[in-house]
Amino acid sequence: THCISSAASDVYKRQTINIDGKTALLGDKVYYRVHIDASRLTDTAYKVWRLGAVDDYDEEYLTLDAKHVEILDETGRDRTGEFNIQDKDGVLYAFAKTVDTQIPATGETVPGDPQPDDLKAYSEKTDKDYDPLKDPSIDQSLLGHTYQVVMPMTVTKVKDGHTVENTATQVTNDKRDKTNTVTNPLKEINPTKDVTVQVGGDSIDGKSVYLNHTFLYRLDSSILPPGRAYQTVTDWGGTDQLNTEYDQYLGNWAVYASRDLYRDGQMLAAKGEKIAGSGFDSSKFGGNLFTVDADDNGKVTADATQAYLDLVSADNEHEAGWVLYLQCKRIAVADEVPNTWTETINGQPRESNKVVTKTPDMTPSIHLEKVDTPTLKQDGQEQADRDDPKQALKMDADNIGITFIITNTSKTDPATGDGAWFKASDLNLDDSTIVGDAHVDMDSLTYPADWDTLVLKPGESVSVTGTLKGVKEGETHTDRAIVTGTPLVECAPSNGDPFNDKTDGGEDTDPEYSTGDVTEIDGKQLCADTQTASNTDDWNGYRAKPLASTGTAVLGLAGGALAVLLAGGSLLVFRKRHYAQGSGRHTAVNAGK
């Protein structure tokens, strides 16, 4: 006979659990057992010169630990030392050693040593190759017993659907008896990785996770098949190395059954039910089924407890599997954050697929341009934008229309175009005079009709108009504007436990947001982010001096020189004063020259 059993200890080696036809997984340690039956070979009329077995195994998928092949008799006694053993090209040869043999016909003793050095060649000999007068035979006291050749194998390659076959042949002198062939279908199993926002939610693999938002890494275990050749599960868990530059693990985790879980044939937890987690009450299971720990370097380790391993080991009738969620927070902008996890079952590691998320720079910002309305209408924004005193407008009157153009310049997610929004009614426009005494009348600004409901999305602009009043003849004027606003961004869920004790992960609960008050616009939940200020923008203008009367022509030269001197002196003082205020860009100029 010839059977196969799975085991991990010496105790098991002496038990024959027939696993013919059962499924083998990568890393499984199985013991093929080849039987040599010499029980009926006593009192034969001839000497038994050769006794052993040849076992042809599938070396592409199985690796034999030839050093630990053992031969046991029917009492379980180790008889390995009495046999020669060789492993060659996927075939194991085990033959009883030749011993010093007395030849009655000659009265001589033929030495048993040296032993055959090539057991393949030895196994292929026939009776014709054996000379009973010159060749040694085996120890005849081995006869009358049965032996078991125990071959420790490891499944080192799997291919779904492939069946490994193992056929042994007993060799007694010239007689060859094929034993039954043992077959084991191989099953390829693999863990998978995903990333999502909520338990059971759609995958966001390849998509964006926004800065300071929480999300879930999803770690699906392999699915253990029923009818396993190696039924005992000694360990089941894995590690996930987070990139702490981008991902902060928040300490919240949960495990759900991905297949029904049984105890003593009764369902203990249904597929999709939460069976472990941070702060989870596991009393119904008689204790924790999983532990999850993280080190300071962002390596998260999950392990099934002995309680869970015992449940799975005891049930070889059903599939087994689980899914772990880890709550993380994205803490930096990134083009690409890859993540995988490594699952280990019975000491055999398996790598998952890779998921990738990105975090676009979506910094909220607003931009302000301040222009004079007449030039804007006639020549366009560029001509009307008088940031520099050299571009100052020569004004014909003491007042002029001013237009403030406010643009949402927030950075966006290239994939979706999403970015911060600004409610126009939240914008606060401020204008102050830098040079001169005139000012923009901020109490009589004109806003668009839909100002109270208007929302500026990225790239959109709005114009507010007002009037600059009080520029006197001969005076230069500079005023500076700035706008502040509160950006509205997609609400970031809080760092609280997203799983709570509901089996669905609490998707029906109202999310608590970690950022500001919630505003709903176009069905989107938006939250207030930190207030943002625009650039400052200047506008420059001047009015010419009134023409001097002709009666002072004689004094013109001296008077003119004195005026320039006085003006120059006052300009220097003025310059100094403004530099002292840190406003080096805005120097007074005699724009009337």
Task: Identify the meaning behind each predicted range.
Residues 24-49, 207-236, 387-419:
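Short beta-strand elements of extracellular/lumenal beta-sandwich folds
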Residues 564-593:
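C-terminal membrane-anchoring or membrane-association module
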Residues 46-119, 233-304, 410, 415-458:
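A surface/secretory-pathway sequence property marking extracellular, secreted
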Residues 542-559:
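Extracellular Ser/Thr-rich, low-complexity/disordered mucin-like segments
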Residues 1-8, 12:
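Single conserved hydrophobic/aromatic residue that forms the stacking wall/gate
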Residues 34-35, 97-165, 219-220, 296-342, ...:
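Low-complexity, intrinsically disordered segments enriched in Ser/Thr together with acidic residues
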Residues 175-186, 350-359, 496-542:
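Terminal edge beta-strands and adjacent linker/stalk segments
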Residues 16-18, 79, 84-88, 93-141, ...:
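Surface-exposed intrinsically disordered loops and tails
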